[in-house]
């Protein structure tokens, strides 16, 4: 309808063909696509340029308020601490019980391994007196020392038999001559004293020395056994009124005594001579073994001092003496 409103008699308006909106839109469009277009390339597809969006207005930073955690009450803290202590106590009790159980097991194992019933002297079960010592050469004595240790044990047995035969010889001598009653009484005393003393004073020390390689026990044996050899020589000589049936006593009965008594006394004198000879031989053998072990007198002194100071009896006596001296002052 606008075409009818125009005045056909008016001057015509100059129309610019380049002012057409469709033309201006094309001319204002970005020319990047034309610059990137290559008509000679294999693909004639134009590169699409993404349109960039303008950033929006910046928002002000807002600080979020921090929320404080709730503080525990004193009752809750005390309850938590008590619960922790209870847990620790239970753990300690459990560990203590476990340690006690292991210690008991170790003690039982050690008791089963080391505790042995005494077997010497070998007495019958009905006897009220029980064995006093444990003796086993195969388990306690090293293989290198078993033979010499057994020989010393056999020497002690020969020593006991000789003293018993000496008692019988002195009894026969007393029956043939009543003046020899003193010799018979002393022979009984020697048998009752020297038999156990020899076992305790020189045989047991050498047994302990070979068992544990103890220098102090070696020195005890050497001292006592040397005295024992001296006693053997006195006994084999047979001095009068000493309670021994030696060579002099046996020869004195040949003139005015029965022949049987003389023979018995000479046999006993031969036993004393045999004991003296075996004692010298075994003393030499033990000394050779002693030097082979590397023991010394200084080591024996150290073992003696350690044994003395570790003894409860010695410590008790020393403390009592010190207390008495302090009170006296």
From Swiss-Prot:
<keyword id="KW-0967">Endosome</keyword>
<comment type="similarity">
    <text>Belongs to the SCAMP family.</text>
</comment>
<feature type="transmembrane region" description="Helical">
    <location>
        <begin position="219"/>
        <end position="239"/>
    </location>
</feature>
<dbReference type="GO" id="GO:0015031">
    <property type="term" value="P:protein transport"/>
</dbReference>
<keyword id="KW-1133">Transmembrane helix</keyword>
<feature type="transmembrane region" description="Helical">
    <location>
        <begin position="154"/>
        <end position="174"/>
    </location>
</feature>
<feature type="modified residue" description="Phosphoserine">
    <location>
        <position position="320"/>
    </location>
</feature>
<protein>
    <recommendedName>
        <fullName>Secretory carrier-associated membrane protein 2</fullName>
    </recommendedName>
</protein>
<feature type="region of interest" description="Disordered">
    <location>
        <begin position="1"/>
        <end position="74"/>
    </location>
</feature>
<feature type="topological domain" description="Lumenal">
    <location>
        <begin position="175"/>
        <end position="181"/>
    </location>
</feature>
<dbReference type="GO" id="GO:0016020">
    <property type="term" value="C:membrane"/>
</dbReference>
<keyword id="KW-0472">Membrane</keyword>
<dbReference type="InterPro" id="IPR007273">
    <property type="entry name" value="SCAMP"/>
</dbReference>
<comment type="function">
    <text>Functions in post-Golgi recycling pathways. Acts as a recycling carrier to the cell surface.</text>
</comment>
<dbReference type="Pfam" id="PF04144">
    <property type="entry name" value="SCAMP"/>
</dbReference>
<keyword id="KW-0812">Transmembrane</keyword>
<dbReference type="GO" id="GO:0055038">
    <property type="term" value="C:recycling endosome membrane"/>
</dbReference>
<keyword id="KW-0597">Phosphoprotein</keyword>
<feature type="topological domain" description="Cytoplasmic">
    <location>
        <begin position="203"/>
        <end position="218"/>
    </location>
</feature>
<feature type="region of interest" description="Interaction with SLC9A7">
    <location>
        <begin position="203"/>
        <end position="218"/>
    </location>
</feature>
<feature type="modified residue" description="Phosphoserine">
    <location>
        <position position="319"/>
    </location>
</feature>
<feature type="compositionally biased region" description="Polar residues">
    <location>
        <begin position="40"/>
        <end position="51"/>
    </location>
</feature>
<feature type="topological domain" description="Cytoplasmic">
    <location>
        <begin position="284"/>
        <end position="329"/>
    </location>
</feature>
<feature type="transmembrane region" description="Helical">
    <location>
        <begin position="263"/>
        <end position="283"/>
    </location>
</feature>
<feature type="topological domain" description="Lumenal">
    <location>
        <begin position="240"/>
        <end position="262"/>
    </location>
</feature>
<keyword id="KW-0813">Transport</keyword>
<comment type="subunit">
    <text>Interacts with SLC6A4 and SLC9A7. Interacts with SLC9A5; this interaction regulates SLC9A5 cell-surface targeting and SLC9A5 activity.</text>
</comment>
<feature type="topological domain" description="Cytoplasmic">
    <location>
        <begin position="1"/>
        <end position="153"/>
    </location>
</feature>
<dbReference type="GO" id="GO:0032588">
    <property type="term" value="C:trans-Golgi network membrane"/>
</dbReference>
<keyword id="KW-0653">Protein transport</keyword>
<feature type="transmembrane region" description="Helical">
    <location>
        <begin position="182"/>
        <end position="202"/>
    </location>
</feature>
<feature type="compositionally biased region" description="Polar residues">
    <location>
        <begin position="19"/>
        <end position="31"/>
    </location>
</feature>
<keyword id="KW-0333">Golgi apparatus</keyword>
């Amino acid at each position: 309808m606008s075409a009818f409103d125009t005045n056909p008699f008016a001057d015509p308006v100059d129309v610019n063909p380049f002012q057409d909106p469709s033309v201006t839109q094309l001319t204002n469009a970005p020319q990047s696509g034309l610059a990137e277009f290559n008509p000679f390339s294999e693909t004639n597809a134009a590169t699409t340029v993404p349109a960039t969006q303008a950033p929006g207005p910046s928002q002000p930073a807002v600080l979020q308020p921090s929320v404080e955690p709730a503080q525990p009450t004193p009752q809750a803290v005390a309850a938590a601490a008590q619960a922790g202590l209870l847990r620790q106590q239970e753990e300690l009790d459990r560990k203590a019980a476990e340690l006690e159980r292991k210690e008991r097991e170790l003690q039982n194992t050690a008791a089963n391994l080391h505790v042995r019933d005494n077997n010497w002297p070998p007495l019958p079960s009905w006897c009220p007196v029980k064995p006093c010592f444990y003796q086993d050469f195969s388990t306690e004595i090293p293989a290198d020392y078993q033979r010499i240790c057994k020989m010393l044990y056999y020497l002690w047995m020969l020593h006991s038999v000789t003293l018993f035969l000496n008692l019988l010889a002195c009894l026969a001598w007393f029956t043939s001559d009543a003046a020899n009653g003193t010799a018979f009484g002393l022979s009984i005393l020697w048998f009752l004293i020297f038999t156990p003393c020899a076992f305790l004073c020189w045989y047991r020390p050498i047994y302990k020395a070979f068992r544990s390689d103890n220098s102090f026990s070696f020195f005890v044996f050497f001292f006592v056994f040397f005295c024992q050899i001296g006693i053997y020589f006195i006994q084999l000589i047979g001095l009068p009124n000493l309670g021994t049936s030696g060579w002099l006593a046996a020869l004195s009965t040949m003139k005015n005594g029965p022949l049987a008594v003389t023979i018995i006394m000479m046999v006993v004198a031969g036993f004393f001579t045999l004991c003296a000879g075996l004692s010298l031989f075994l003393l030499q053998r033990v000394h050779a073994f002693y030097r082979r072990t590397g023991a010394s007198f200084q080591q024996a002194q150290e073992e003696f001092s350690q044994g003395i100071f570790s003894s409860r009896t010695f410590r008790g006596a020393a403390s009592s003496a010190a207390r008495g001296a302090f009170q006296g002052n």
